[in-house]
From Swiss-Prot:
KW NADP (keyword) present: no
Protein name in the entry: Guanine nucleotide exchange factor SopE
Annotated Pfam families: SecIII_SopE_N, SopE_GEF
Transmembrane segments: none
UniProt keyword list: GTPase activation, Guanine-nucleotide releasing factor, Secreted, Virulence
Principal cellular location given in the protein's record: secreted
Example GO molecular function: GTPase activator activity
Residue numbers spanned by region GEF catalytic domain: 78-240
Localization per record: Secreted
Gene3D superfamilies (alphabetical): SopE-like, GEF domain (1.10.4120.10)
Length: 240
């Protein structure tokens, strides 16, 4: 019987080939698993996106639903109350009090912005009246500036007149009016309605931010409004 003996070199070659085949098989299996994992990930992601899209469409459909009756019936649904309810929901979505409870700096900035807006509104109204009557507004500006400073508002003094650094329009009114105007543009054609919606926006904003003044040294917006009105009345009563 002939005995076949493999040389060490041939054995090593066969062993290397076997090892390479195993490595390729392992790599192939690993690649297949990776591809399958990626595929499953995209399937899951696509499913989630689809669910979100459907949810968003349902929400949007509910929010913009009108009765499918006559044209006059559809118009009857769109009233001032619908617009005001939308503005109130927009304010709730902004979540001023929620943000303020988590961020003291935001709460402080909100209080300052609200009081500065009250200051600006009263200043402009009274100054316009005094100027129309030919009355010097400098004493009035000095007095309401001092009131703003005493209220704790930051600002600068120039020519003996203190001006709050955040003086300007109420920063929360614009988002409410703009969003409502975009959704219901037909309701904002009339200037009287525009003014009415702005007054409503100011009202619900003041109600929303009122609790932020409960535990601070600043006066509430209503108290500050009264202080400025009393100052303005001193000058207005002397107008001819």
């Amino acid at each position: 019987m002939t005995k076949i003996t493999l040389s060490p070199q041939n054995f090593r070659i066969q062993k290397q080939e076997t090892t390479l085949l195993k490595e390729k098989s392992t790599e192939k299996n690993s690649l297949a698993k990776s591809i399958l994992a990626v595929k499953n990930h995209f399937i899951e992601l696509r499913s989630k996106l689809s669910e979100r899209f459907i949810s968003h469409k349902n929400t949007e459909s509910s929010a913009t639903h009108f009765h499918r009756g006559s044209a006059s019936e559809g118009r009857a649904v769109l009233t001032n109350k619908v617009v005001k309810d939308f503005m109130l929901q927009t304010l709730n979505d902004i979540d001023i009090r929620g943000s303020a409870s988590k961020d003291p700096a935001y709460a402080s900035q909100t209080r300052e912005a609200i009081l500065s807006a009250v200051y600006s509104k009263n200043k402009d109204q009274c100054c316009n009246l005094l100027i129309s009557k030919g009355i010097n507004i400098a004493p009035f500006l000095q007095e309401i500036g001092e009131a703003a400073k005493n209220a704790g508002l930051p600002g600068t003094t120039k020519n003996d007149v203190f001006t709050p650094s955040g003086a300007g329009a109420n920063p929360f009114i614009t988002p409410l009016i703009s969003s409502a105007n975009s959704k219901y543009p037909r309701m904002f054609i009339n200037q009287h309605q525009q003014a009415s919606f702005k007054i409503y926006a100011e009202k619900i904003i003041m109600t929303e931010v009122a609790p932020l003044f409960n535990e601070c040294a600043m006066p509430t917006p209503q108290q500050f409004q009264l202080i400025l009105e009393n100052i303005a009345n001193k000058y207005i009563q002397y107008t001819p």
